[in-house]
From Swiss-Prot:
One of its GO terms (molecular function) is RNA binding. It comes from Herminiimonas arsenicoxydans. GO terms for cellular component: cytosol. This is RNA-binding protein Hfq. One of its GO terms (biological process) is regulation of translation, ncRNA-mediated.
Length: 78
């Protein structure tokens, strides 16, 4: 089931994953997590640092990449 949110989330998270861009993930409770996106699905993001953490998307407030991400490359993958 694809909705508008997935149409925005998936290309962004996939670009971060493919390019191994370091990210800071801020949770709704204010905690900051850092690492690389290892994988993701509709409900969770796997964040890799010294260990792999499974972070539920409903707990995420903001994803901040360490550098700019080119999303135009994602249209070629489809």
């Amino acid at each position: 089931m694809t909705n508008k949110g997935q149409l925005l989330q998936d290309p962004f998270l996939n670009a971060l994953r493919k390019e191994h861009v370091p990210v800071s993930i801020y949770l709704v409770n204010g905690i900051k997590l850092q690492g690389h996106i290892e994988s993701f699905d509709q409900y969770v993001v796997l964040l890799r640092n010294t260990v792999t953490q499974m972070v539920y998307k409903h707990a995420i407030s903001t994803v901040v990449p360490a550098r700019a991400v080119n999303l135009s490359l994602e249209s070629d993958a489809e």
